[in-house]
Each structure stands twice: as structure tokens, then as C-alpha cells.
């Protein structure tokens, strides 16, 4: 089989949206490369850094590589893929010195390249995300989330995902009922389950995402707690008295359903909203207030913001 590699040079802030677009167009695997990844890859057990050629790694920003079967359909889609990526800037996602290149690669290269740069990531002092193929020995009481990030959704390395997991660690109580809107890889649902949630509904409009979530949920043996549903936000979800709703999606999407979140939450229930670029935080904050939610806290990592709000106790 012949394969094509799509290489996109962009910013750290754009990593997850770009990776999601590439996956939606049918990428079989995605790798993310930055300076820190290359340095870590070449560090041996004694801490020595091997010499790197300047051309071996990006000078700034990030290089995202996605691998596609080289079919007639894919070749015809190339201009559409490039334009869809460029259109992300209309959502105020900074693309930086955007570059889009397509190369041919062999079978072996595409099958392993994307795995090389994904390593265990410690999110909190209790929670670590580990790629499914790596051997990792947890410390006492450490919570391990195994992920296969081949589908490119929410690997845990993106600031928005980390902000959500930290908020879940702070607010989720054992026995809580959770709704995860826009679940992607299922990482937030899995984190909720391992933190002690009683039941979790994970929704996503994208069929590829729901399949990826189901696979990761099974990998983590949490399928008895988590139900995955292909669904548009909270539309036709008739749950009420939910303890926590969590959504790691773009600000423009969060603005579509704060009233539905309010209806779903029990009095005192918590809404964790991330995926919000700093410039959009005020708009989202006002929308949540207008829906009747009370702003509890705002957390920031880089240019990304998470807003934690609550339904008032009536």
C-alpha cells in the first residue's frame, strides 16, 4: 500500500484542533513534534543530550504529521484539507507560520513515526496518562489512564485536557454522576471513572471520536461505568440532577448550550468548561452567568482557560 504524510507547521495552541481536523479527514495516525520532544527523545539514562542538527526539529511552534492511504479520494481532498485547517483561524485559533506539505512515505514509516513522540504525562500528583504500548510502573495510589492516541483526540498533553483533569480531581466526589460533552478520546470520562464517579455519559457528534472513546474505555476497563453516545452536545439528553458536566470544546461551541447545562445539573452541581482561548474567556463567562450559573473559579495554562461554574443551591 502507498501512504501519504501530511505535514503541518503550526502553533502549540492549534495542536488539538489541527489534529482533530486531520483525523476527521481519515488520518490513520498522527504525530506531534516540538523541540522538547526531540530533546527528550535523545536524552539517555545518564541525562546526556545527543547533538542535534538544526534541521532535525522545528525552530518554533509544532510540526504535526498525519498519515493517509494514498487513494484517489485522498488526493482530491488535499486542497479541502488545507483550506479547512486555514479556516481554524476564524475561531481565533492562532496558526502561526502555517505551512502545509504532502509527502509520500513507506508502510513502516507511517506505522511507527507517530508513536515515537508520545510518552507518559503526569497531569496531577495522582494522575498520569500513559500510551498503551509503554510499560509504566505506577507509584502507590497513582491513577493510570492508558490511551491509544492513534485517533488524535485529547491525548492529555494539551493544556485544555490537563485543565479539565485537574478540575475533575478537585471537584469530583466518589459516587458522582457525570456527563462528558465532546468526549473525543474518552480521556475525561476515564479520569472521572478512576476518580470514583458512579456513572458517566460520554457524548460526541463525531462517530470516529465515539469509536476511539469506546476503545480507550475498554482498554481502561471502565466500560461498566461509562456509556458512550453519538450525540450533538446535550440535545435530547434528558438527564437532570447530574453532579458534574465537563466539556473540553471550543468556546464557540460552549456558547451554544449553557442553558442545557443548567437544566442538567443538580443544585450545587459543577460545570467544568475548557477549550477556551484566553480572548474568548469573558464572552463564555458572561454566557454562563446569563444561563443562571455562578462562576466558581477560572484556571489558566498558557493561552487556554478553564471556567468552573456551579448551579446555585435553591
UniProtKB/Swiss-Prot annotation:
Binding site for S-adenosyl-L-methionine: 161, 182, 204, 248
First-listed, main subcellular location of the protein, grouped into a coarse class: cytoplasm
GO biological process: methylation
InterPro entries: Ribosomal_L11_MeTrfase_PrmA, Ribosomal_PrmA_MeTrfase, SAM-dependent_MTases_sf
Enzyme Commission identifier(s): 2.1.1.-
Pfam name, any one: PrmA
Chain segments annotated as transmembrane: none
Any one of the GO CC terms: cytoplasm
Catalysed reactions, as listed in the record: L-lysyl-[protein] + 3 S-adenosyl-L-methionine = N(6),N(6),N(6)-trimethyl-L-lysyl-[protein] + 3 S-adenosyl-L-homocysteine + 3 H(+)
Protein localization: Cytoplasm
Record keywords: Cytoplasm, Methyltransferase, S-adenosyl-L-methionine, Transferase
Cited Gene3D superfamilies: Vaccinia Virus protein VP39 (3.40.50.150)
A GO molecular-function annotation: protein-lysine N-methyltransferase activity
HAMAP family (UniProt xref): Methyltr_PrmA (MF_00735)
NCBIfam families with a match to the protein in the record: prmA
Entry's family note: Belongs to the methyltransferase superfamily. PrmA family.
Known function: Methylates ribosomal protein L11.
PANTHER family in alphabetical order: ELECTRON TRANSFER FLAVOPROTEIN BETA SUBUNIT LYSINE METHYLTRANSFERASE (PTHR43648:SF1)
Protein name: Ribosomal protein L11 methyltransferase
Gene that specifies this protein: prmA
Amino acid at each position: 500500500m502507498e501512504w501519504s504524510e501530511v505535514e503541518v507547521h503550526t502553533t502549540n495552541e492549534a495542536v488539538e484542533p489541527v489534529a482533530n481536523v486531520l483525523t476527521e479527514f481519515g488520518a490513520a495516525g498522527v504525530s506531534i513534534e516540538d523541540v522538547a520532544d526531540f530533546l527528550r527523545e535523545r536524552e539517555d539514562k545518564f541525562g546526556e543530550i545527543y547533538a542535534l542538527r538544526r534541521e532535525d526539529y522545528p525552530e518554533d511552534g509544532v510540526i504535526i504529521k498525519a498519515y493517509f492511504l494514498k487513494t484517489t479520494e485522498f488526493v482530491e481532498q488535499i486542497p479541502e484539507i488545507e483550506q479547512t485547517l486555514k479556516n481554524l483561524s476564524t475561531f481565533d485559533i492562532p496558526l502561526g507560520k502555517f505551512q502545509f506539505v504532502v509527502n509520500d512515505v513507506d508502510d513502516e514509516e507511517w506505522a511507527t513515526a507517530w508513536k515515537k513522540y508520545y510518552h507518559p504525562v503526569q497531569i496531577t500528583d495522582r494522575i498520569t496518562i500513559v500510551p498503551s504500548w509503554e510499560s509504566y510502573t505506577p507509584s502507590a495510589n497513582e491513577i493510570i489512564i492508558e490511551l491509544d492516541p492513534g485517533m488524535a483526540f485529547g491525548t492529555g498533553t494539551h493544556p485544555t485536557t490537563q485543565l479539565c483533569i485537574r478540575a475533575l480531581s478537585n471537584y469530583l466526589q466518589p459516587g458522582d454522576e457525570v456527563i462528558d460533552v465532546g468526549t473525543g478520546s474518552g480521556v475525561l470520562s476515564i479520569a472521572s471513572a478512576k476518580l470514583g464517579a458512579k456513572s458517566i455519559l460520554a457524548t460526541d457528534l463525531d462517530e470516529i471520536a465515539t469509536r476511539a472513546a469506546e476503545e480507550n474505555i475498554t482498554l481502561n476497563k471502565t466500560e461498566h461505568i461509562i456509556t458512550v453516545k453519538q450525540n450533538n452536545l446535550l440535545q435530547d439528553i434528558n438527564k437532570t440532577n447530574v453532579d458534574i458536566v465537563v466539556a473540553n470544546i471550543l468556546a464557540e461551541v460552549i456558547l451554544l448550550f449553557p442553558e442545557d447545562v443548567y437544566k442538567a445539573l443538580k443544585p450545587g452541581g459543577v460545570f467544568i468548561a475548557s477549550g477556551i482561548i484566553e480572548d474568548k474567556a469573558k464572552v463564555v463567562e458572561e454566557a454562563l452567568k446569563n444561563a443562571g450559573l455562578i462562576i466558581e473559579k477560572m484556571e489558566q495554562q498558557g493561552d487556554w482557560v478553564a471556567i468552573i461554574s456551579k448551579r446555585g443551591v435553591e
